[in-house]
């Protein structure tokens, strides 16, 4: 199976070089020993004078065929297709007439026994490699979606992809599926907004109100109301974080433990109540405008909102129940349990900060990167656990035998030292005293730097790619929204002009009558 000289024979194949694919490195995939003569039997380079110009002999028809893909010609023996009978090229051998051949390829030259396929010749290079050597690779410069279409066209299953390429291929397909799903949701919202403007006046007014509410709540860049709503939401989140920090001051905590409430404590409670009221109103507005209530309640950001809002109301109920059960001379066990529950619930208010992900592209990128890099984070955790399990017992034995250090009392205590040392934090609460212990500490520091650098590079590239995708998607949504508004305004102007025209005509008719 070789490239024939002739038309497009000077095609630049440097872009299709497999040297840019890191999966060919022996560390990733050990190469099998080549069988001498196999490639010569499966594909043979033809000289210029050997190219069939007027016709070919009958024995050549039975022995070899010519494949023309996008102007690039390949010659291969029929025996090569015996191993792939279910592929599109393998089906050529089962064709018995001209109509069967045209059902498989785009055209056929009887004189030269040449089959034409109007496909991308660059993508066919990987198909050629698979038919020739049995290795299916996805080049880094090739689009995964185009490659998927080529596999479907040539009848080659995705399972033939090597492990390294298949993982990257499935990741690209998954990212594209997520992007298509988000675009379909936006299209559904836009179509619902267009359908809501029906002929009935009441339905049209309700639909317009819902569309404006959706733009204000879910689309900050849709207009001034959306920007104001987003700014208010961010402001209340900031006020909540500051109010939570102020409520932990020692003076306020002492008053709370003693059962007293000063003016400052009362002000903190009022600020918290106002913020929770705003968050509750925002949650209700999002619930009202959601097309699918079940999908809205199932989303991660909605769950975060519920976990952050409910503790306030639960605290009020628990305080009321505790006040009802408080009796003179009764034990404090119940009140202690109630106080513990209240402290845990109040600590959950810090989840309000996660609400900023609705309005921050950076936080959305961080969440998307964490979801896409679960494997890298797992590798990082595995590296750290193995290194910690190695250095902690070693330092414990050295320090207890040679320095009798009081800090390293047990191996679990040394685990804490190993974590702090390998992450290069270095609190200084546990310091090795002996020279061998300091050598172990140095080895731990260097190992931590190297081990954390390996997955971080991949995570950084994923973060950059995710940020670029979300930014392009946001720009695309804004552009589509602007086009939709322009189209809507033009339709309204046309309808108003028609109403004026036909309205004047109908009035003239009434006057004549």
Curated annotation (Swiss-Prot):
One of the protein's GO biological processes: potassium ion transport
Motif annotated as Selectivity filter, chain positions: 424-429
Function: Regulatory alpha-subunit of the voltage-gated potassium (Kv) channel which, when coassembled with KCNB1 or KCNB2, can modulate their expression and their gating kinetics by acting on deactivation upon repolarization and inactivation during maintained depolarization. Potassium channel subunit that does not form functional channels by itself.
Spans through the membrane: 225-246, 268-289, 301-321, 339-359, 375-396, 439-467
Stretches of the chain found on the membrane's Extracellular side: 247-267, 322-338, 397-411, 432-438
Protein topology in the membrane: Multi-pass membrane protein
This protein's domain notes: The transmembrane segment S4 functions as a voltage-sensor and is characterized by a series of positively charged amino acids at every third position. Channel opening and closing is effected by a conformation change that affects the position and orientation of the voltage-sensor paddle formed by S3 and S4 within the membrane. A transmembrane electric field that is positive inside would push the positively charged S4 segment outwards, thereby opening the pore, while a field that is negative inside would pull the S4 segment inwards and close the pore.
Keyword Transmembrane helix annotated: yes
Cysteines joined through disulfide linkages: none
Cellular compartments annotated: Cell membrane
Stretches within the membrane that do not traverse it: 412-423, 424-431
GO MF annotation terms: potassium channel regulator activity; voltage-gated potassium channel activity
GO cellular component entries: membrane; plasma membrane; voltage-gated potassium channel complex
Gene name for this UniProt entry: KCNG1
Name under which the protein is recorded: Voltage-gated potassium channel regulatory subunit KCNG1
Pfam family, one: BTB_2
Keyword flag Transport: yes
InterPro entries in alphabetical order: BTB/POZ_dom, Ion_trans_dom, K_chnl_volt-dep_Kv, K_chnl_volt-dep_Kv6, SKP1/BTB/POZ_sf, T1-type_BTB, VG_K_chnl, Volt_channel_dom_sf
Topology Cytoplasmic: residue spans: 1-224, 290-300, 360-374, 468-513
Gene3D superfamilies: 1.10.287.70, Potassium Channel Kv1.1, Chain A (3.30.710.10), Voltage-gated potassium channels. Chain C (1.20.120.350)
Skewed-composition ranges (Basic and acidic residues): 191-204
Tissue occurrence: Expressed in brain and placenta, and at much lower levels in kidney and pancreas.
Subunit structure: Heterotetramer with KCNB1. Heterotetramer with KCNB2.
Keywords from the UniProt entry: Cell membrane, Ion channel, Ion transport, Membrane, Potassium, Potassium channel, Potassium transport, Transmembrane, Transmembrane helix, Transport, Voltage-gated channel
Residue segments, region Disordered: 184-204
CDD domains reported in the protein's UniProt record: BTB_POZ_KCNG1_2
Family the entry assigns: Belongs to the potassium channel family. G (TC 1.A.1.2) subfamily. Kv6.1/KCNG1 sub-subfamily.
């Amino acid at each position: 199976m070789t490239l024939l000289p002739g038309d497009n024979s000077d095609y630049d194949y440097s872009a299709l070089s497999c040297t840019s694919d890191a999966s060919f490195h022996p560390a990733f995939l050990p190469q099998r020993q080549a069988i001498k003569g196999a490639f010569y039997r499966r594909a043979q380079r033809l000289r210029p004078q050997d190219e069939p110009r007027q016709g070919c002999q009958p024995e050549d028809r039975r022995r070899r065929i010519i494949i023309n893909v996008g102007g690039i010609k390949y010659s291969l023996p029929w025996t090569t297709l015996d191993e792939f009978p279910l592929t599109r090229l393998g089906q050529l051998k089962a064709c018995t007439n001209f109509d069967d051949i045209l059902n498989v390829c785009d055209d056929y030259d009887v004189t030269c026994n040449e089959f034409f396929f109007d496909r991308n010749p660059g993508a066919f290079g990987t198909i050629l490699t698979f038919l020739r050597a049995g290795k299916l690779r996805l080049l880094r410069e090739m689009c995964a979606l185009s490659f998927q279409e080529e596999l479907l066209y040539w009848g080659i299953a995705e399972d033939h992809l090597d492990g390294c390429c298949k993982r990257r291929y499935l990741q690209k397909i998954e990212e594209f599926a997520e992007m298509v799903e988000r675009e379909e949701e936006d299209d559904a919202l836009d179509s619902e907004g267009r359908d809501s403007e029906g002929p009935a006046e009441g339905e049209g007014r309700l639909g317009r109100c819902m569309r404006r509410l959706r733009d204000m709540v879910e689309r900050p860049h849709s207009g001034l109301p959306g920007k104001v709503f987003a700014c208010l939401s961010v402001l209340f989140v900031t006020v909540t974080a500051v109010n939570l920090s102020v409520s932990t001051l020692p003076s306020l905590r002492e008053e709370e433990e003693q059962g007293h409430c000063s003016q400052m404590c009362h002000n903190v409670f009022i600020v918290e109540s106002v913020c929770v009221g705003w968050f509750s109103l925002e949650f209700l507005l999002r619930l009202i405008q959601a097309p699918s209530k079940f999908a809205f309640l199932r989303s991660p950001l909605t769950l975060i909102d519920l976990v952050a809002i409910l503790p306030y109301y639960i605290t009020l109920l628990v305080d009321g129940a505790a006040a009802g059960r408080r009796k003179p001379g009764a034990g404090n066990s119940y009140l202690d349990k109630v106080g513990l529950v209240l402290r845990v619930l109040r600590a959950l208010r810090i989840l309000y900060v996660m609400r900023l992900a609705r309005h921050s592209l950076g936080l959305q990128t961080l969440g998307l990167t964490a979801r896409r890099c679960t494997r890298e984070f797992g590798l990082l955790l595995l590296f750290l656990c193995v290194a910690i399990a190695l250095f902690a017992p070693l330092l414990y034995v050295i320090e207890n035998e040679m320095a009798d250090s009081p800090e390293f009392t047990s191996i679990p205590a040394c685990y804490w030292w190993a974590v702090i040392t390998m992450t290069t934090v270095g609190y200084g609460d546990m310091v090795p005293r002996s020279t061998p212990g300091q050598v172990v500490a140095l080895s731990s520091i260097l190992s931590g730097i190297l081990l954390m650098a390996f997955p971080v590079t991949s995570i950084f590239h994923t973060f950059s790619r995710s940020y670029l995708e979300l930014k392009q998607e946001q720009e695309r949504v804004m552009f589509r929204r602007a086009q939709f508004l322009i189209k809507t305004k033009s339709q309204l102007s046309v309808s108003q002009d028609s109403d004026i025209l036909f309205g004047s005509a109908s009035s003239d008719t009434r006057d004549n009558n």
